[in-house]
């Protein structure tokens, strides 16, 4: 028998980057399906636009850097970046917005730092924030869920609105955003923040059609539950660890509960925070990015808790209704500090 001498490491992880990225893409299917059901075909069109833009942008930069295009594109990271950005923006946003945001995310937020594994900030959230700051009106023009919508665009209408701004019958975004009460609709979080600032009581706000859902708002509660299902599957597949999602959701729920108990007339109830906006998408698909999140177990708990606190503060007191993207980027800034103070002690070394 011949024994081959090899250098360490002797224990190998069989899961390559492309495999993990593929698992995340598959886990996103329930969330995508829910958004398609409640908000129409625009979500699918945005995903296709973002995916093509991400692959082309990544290929262009790799070509300029004289690196292997095919080998890098196979890791599926560009596709995941495009997907996360596409599901975060309104389904009928103009086509050039998702292209601009995706190209910025891939080229500036990822490749400019050296590519996958080198970027300090989540690329998809960088692209989202750039779009939100630059085009706030378009980025907050969400359609009402089909449960309370008057006009539900079909596949052809969705394409026409995205590329031309109006449907074949001449309808525009203002028409499509009308709810059953004849008022243009926004997300539950946006509606709550705007109504509170206008002096409406929480009891009055909860009577709006957008809050006709069982838990947290028409459509959005099921979208978040779908992303939660995908996240649980990722945990079961061991593609992500439990520390960040758990600490994020527990902290957000705790802050929301305390705030609601102390100020029920101005702050949203915990179920609205947990099941509205991008809460579950952020908890399981964005914050768990292995490149931009903390790398130690204690650090992951701190990182997730910090993000949860920031989301609640931005939603409750900030100028933006959701806040997940800003919370993720602010938490990304603290990762080097968190990792420095939570790294495990080398065996045999004493403190001091």
UniProtKB/Swiss-Prot annotation:
FMN phosphoryl threonine: residues carrying this PTM: 187
InterPro entries according to UniProt: NqrB/RnfD, RnfD_bac
Protein topology in the membrane: Multi-pass membrane protein
Keyword rRNA processing: no
Keywords noted in UniProt: Cell inner membrane, Cell membrane, Electron transport, Flavoprotein, FMN, Membrane, Phosphoprotein, Translocase, Transmembrane, Transmembrane helix, Transport
Primary enzyme class: translocase
E.C. no: 7.-.-.-
Cofactor: FMN
Biological process, per Gene Ontology: electron transport chain; transmembrane transport
UniProt-annotated location(s): Cell inner membrane
Gene Ontology CC: plasma membrane
Transmembrane regions: 20-40, 42-62, 78-109, 123-143, 148-168, 214-234, 242-262, 267-287, 301-321, 322-342
Annotated function: Part of a membrane-bound complex that couples electron transfer with translocation of ions across the membrane. Required to maintain the reduced state of SoxR.
HAMAP family in alphabetical order: RsxD_RnfD
Subunit structure: The complex is composed of six subunits: RsxA, RsxB, RsxC, RsxD, RsxE and RsxG.
Entry's family note: Belongs to the NqrB/RnfD family.
Protein name from the UniProt record: Ion-translocating oxidoreductase complex subunit D
Organism: Escherichia coli O6:K15:H31 (strain 536 / UPEC)
């Amino acid at each position: 028998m011949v024994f081959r001498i090899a250098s360490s490491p002797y224990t190998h992880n069989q899961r390559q980057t492309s495999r993990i990225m593929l698992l995340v893409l598959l886990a996103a299917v329930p969330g995508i399906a829910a958004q398609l059901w409640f908000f129409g075909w625009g979500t699918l069109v945005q995903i296709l636009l973002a995916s093509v833009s991400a692959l082309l942008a990544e290929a262009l930069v790799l070509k300029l850097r004289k690196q292997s295009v095919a080998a890098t594109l196979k890791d599926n990271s560009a596709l995941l970046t495009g997907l996360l950005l596409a599901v975060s923006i309104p389904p009928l946003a103009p086509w050039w917005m998702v292209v601009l945001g995706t190209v910025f995310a891939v080229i500036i937020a990822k490749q400019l730092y050296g590519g996958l594994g080198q970027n300090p900030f989540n690329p998809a959230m960088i692209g989202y924030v750039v779009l939100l700051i630059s085009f706030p009106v378009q980025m907050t023009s969400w359609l009402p869920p089909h449960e309370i919508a008057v006009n539900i665009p079909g596949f052809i209408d969705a394409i026409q609105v995205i590329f031309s701004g109006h449907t074949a019958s001449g309808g525009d975004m203002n028409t499509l955003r009308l709810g059953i009460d004849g008022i243009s609709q926004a997300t539950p979080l946006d509606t709550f923040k705007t109504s509170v600032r206008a002096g409406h009581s929480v009891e009055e706000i909860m009577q709006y059609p957008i809050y006709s859902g069982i838990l947290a708002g028409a459509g959005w509660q099921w979208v978040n539950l779908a992303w939660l299902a995908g996240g649980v599957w990722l945990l079961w597949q061991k593609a992500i660890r439990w520390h960040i999602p758990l600490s994020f959701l527990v902290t957000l729920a705790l802050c929301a509960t305390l705030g609601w108990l102390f100020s029920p007339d101005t702050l949203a109830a915990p179920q609205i925070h947990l099941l509205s906006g991008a809460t579950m998408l952020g908890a399981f698909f964005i914050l768990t990015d292995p490149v931009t999140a903390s790398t130690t177990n204690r650090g992951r708990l701190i990182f997730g808790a910090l993000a949860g606190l920031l989301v609640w503060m931005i939603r409750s007191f900030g100028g933006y209704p959701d806040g997940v993207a800003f919370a993720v980027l602010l938490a990304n800034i603290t990762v080097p500090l968190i990792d420095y103070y939570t790294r495990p002690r080398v065996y045999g070394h004493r403190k001091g």
